Structures are given as C-alpha cells and as structure tokens.
C-alpha cells in the first residue's frame, strides 16, 4: 500500500478535477463521454447539459449541438453496466454491452420471468425487422406489434426492448422530434471492439473499464467500482490484480480513515495535486470564491461512487429525497446542498433552486452565473 494518505478534502478536489467539473478542458461531447466511459442518461437533456460542463467553455455546443452528436451516432444510449440507460461512445458500445450483458440479464431475471420475455421471440423479430428499415419510436414499435396481433406495452415492452439491446440487436437512433428512437445496433455501432481490437476478451474488457474509470474518477474503493459498474467485488479485485503495478492502493485519512482507495500509478496532476484546478471555474479564478454546480440528478460525480458518495452530499441532504420535479443536484464547492429544476419553453427557460439551507450572497451570485450558463446552453432567456 502507498505511503501517501488522502483525506476527504483531497479526494473531493481530485474528483472534481478528474471529472473535469473544474478547469474543464475536453473538446467535444463524444470525448467527454469517452472520458467517463459511460454516463447515466435516462434524463437525456440534463445528462447532455452535464457533459457540456466538462468541455472547454469555448467548445460548448449548446443543447442542439449536444443532441446532434447523438443524432449522428457518435454517442448512443443503451443499457450497459447496470439495468438503466447510459450514454456511451458508439465505438465503445459493442465491448461494453458484451461485457455487461450477462450481469444485467441476471439482474433483470425476475422481471423477465414476470413479463414472459422468453416467450416473445416473435415480437423481438418484428421489432428488429422494423428498425432495419429505419429508426422507430417506442410508440411506433408498440403500434406495429399491435397491428401484427402481438400487442405489448408498458413494462413488458420495455423489457423486451432492453433484452434486444443487451443482445446487440437494438441501440438508440436519432431523435424523431422530441422522441427517442431505436435503431439496428450494427447500423450505429462500428464493427470490432474498439480499444480491445477485433476480438472480445473479458479480462481485457474489465481492465479497460477499470483503467478508464480510475482515470476519470480519481480515487475509489473496490465497493465504489463494483456499485458503479454492476460487477462483483471479485471481478473488481480480479481486474485490479490484472492491472498490477498500473494501480496504487492509498489509505484514507480523516473521514476516510480505514478505507482503501485506488488510483492509477501514473495519475495526472489533477489527481495528485488538484488544488490549482479546483477554483478555476470562477471567472476570476479565485479558489476561495464559492462555485455552484447545477448537476443532473444522475451526474457521474454521484453515481460513480457508492461507498464514498457521502463526500459530495452535505449533512442532512438525501440524494434520494426529491420534492416534486426538483430532481437535480445543486452543489456548492462540489457538495450537494439542495435541488434545482429547469422548465424549458419555446422562448425561455425557468431555472428554480430549492436550497436546503440559506445561501450566502456569494453563493446566490454563483447560482445566478449558472443560470446564465443554462440560458446560453438552451439559447433562451432565463428566468428564476
């Protein structure tokens, strides 16, 4: 184990810097997705907003530009790692799905049996044939099945479609207006296994996943990795063993005393000395000035960690405690202290906070700066 010690302050700063939520320097949305490997994405537009926060300010494409990267197929949305939507680069999709499909199928087993997924082979064949003609919305697919005398809807349809995604038959297509579509997997995903080459190897895939996870998440425990990835503790320890001298075990201090955290042996300065990076989001670069982040409800700053997630949550705040449509996380200096929501209209966007404590004047001003960023992102007048 390394002789260095890391406390909660260092780990939080390193995570903010590694996630590129401080001193953001990534050039485009696909690069940001690839940096994070997989980004939880059932909240589609908020997830894209979160990705654009990790780009250089002069490289941020706005909402329409972020969607365009998905429409072009540079980024796709599918079920990987855990049984929920994630955004991934199209050239990572094949190996990520093949790696995680057995675990997700296992997690879905009870629901598969409940809705009778195994008995819906004909329905799957109809869906696959339809998307080979052109991308289809879920509503279109439901209508097509009904027209063929095989109606499916609700949860049953959802699990049939998810199983087809995990079997590498379906993946997201371009938006149809405001609606998501399904497309043929091979039409949107390149052949081969991206960084793994032409053949899939499970050990190589686990190593690739863990190496890239640590590069973008800084420090994490074995349980953090397992909870994020959906793999077992045994799988994670096996991957760490395969990485060998490429990773370093670091003992925690302070609130992390007793924990063993892992980082890459060649971790960059953002991880080893994050101080110079973490105050740079403020216009004047003053590290003592509070920085507000408007984070989507499933931002990777939260979802990447289970065991040590409390580092980013203020005392008395529960990430699962969502009041109405205020589902997103309002953070000050990387720690969630409230909720926020946006309501996007044709000409304006309303941004509303729910502070769980009274903000200081400086924090309120920092929030207003982020409201202005939302206005720019959507190309609409902002109201609060």
Describe each region flagged by the PLM:
Residues 71-80, 84, 165-175, 244-252, ...:
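A short, conserved structural fragment
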Residues 118-135, 202-218, 240:
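Positively charged, polyanion-binding regions of nucleic-acid-associated proteins
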Residues 1-153, 317:
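Phosphate-backbone binding and catalysis cores of DNA-processing enzymes
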Residues 98-109, 186-209, 273-285, 292:
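Short, amphipathic alpha-helical interaction segments positioned at domain boundaries
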Residues 87-93, 176-196, 256-279:
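Short, cationic-aromatic polyanion-contact patches
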């Amino acid at each position: 184990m390394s002789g260095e010690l890391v406390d909660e302050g260092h780990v939080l700063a390193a995570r903010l810097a590694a996630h590129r939520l401080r001193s953001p320097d990534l050039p485009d949305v696909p690069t940001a997705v690839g940096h994070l490997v997989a980004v939880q994405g059932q909240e589609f537009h908020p997830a894209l907003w979160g990705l654009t926060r990790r780009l250089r300010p002069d490289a941020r494409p706005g909402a329409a530009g972020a969607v365009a990267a998905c429409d072009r197929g540079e980024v796709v949305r599918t079920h990987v790692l855990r049984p929920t939507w994630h955004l991934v680069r199209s050239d990572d999709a094949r190996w990520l799905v093949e790696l995680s499909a057995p675990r997700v199928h296992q997690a879905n087993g009870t629901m598969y049996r409940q809705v009778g997924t195994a008995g819906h082979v004909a329905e799957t064949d109809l869906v696959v044939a339809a998307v080979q003609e052109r991308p289809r919305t879920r509503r279109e697919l439901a209508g097509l099945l009904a027209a063929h005398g095989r109606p499916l809807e609700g949860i049953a349809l959802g699990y049939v479609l998810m199983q087809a995604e995990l079997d590498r038959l379906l993946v997201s297509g371009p938006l149809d207006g405001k609606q998501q579509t399904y497309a043929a997997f091979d039409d949107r995903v390149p052949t081969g296994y991206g960084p793994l080459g032409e053949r899939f190897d499970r050990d190589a895939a686990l190593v690739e996943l863990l190496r890239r996870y640590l590069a973008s998440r800084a420090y994490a425990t074995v349980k953090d990795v397992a909870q994020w990835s959906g793999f077992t503790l045994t799988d994670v320890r096996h991957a760490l063993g395969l990485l060998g001298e490429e990773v370093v075990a670091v003992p925690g201090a302070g609130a992390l005393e007793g924990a063993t955290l892992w980082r890459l042996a060649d971790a960059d300065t953002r991880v080893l000395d994050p101080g110079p990076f973490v105050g740079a989001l403020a216009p004047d670069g003053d590290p003592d000035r509070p920085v507000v982040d408007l984070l989507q409800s499933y931002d990777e700053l939260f979802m990447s960690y289970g065991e040590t997630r409390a580092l980013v949550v203020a005392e008395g705040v529960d990430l699962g405690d969502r009041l109405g449509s205020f589902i997103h996380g309002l953070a000050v200096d990387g720690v969630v202290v409230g909720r926020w929501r946006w309501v996007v209209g044709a000409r304006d966007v309303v941004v509303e906070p729910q502070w769980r404590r009274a903000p200081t004047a400086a924090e309120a001003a920092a929030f207003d700066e982020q409201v202005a960023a939302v206005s720019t992102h959507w190309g609409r007048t902002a109201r609060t």
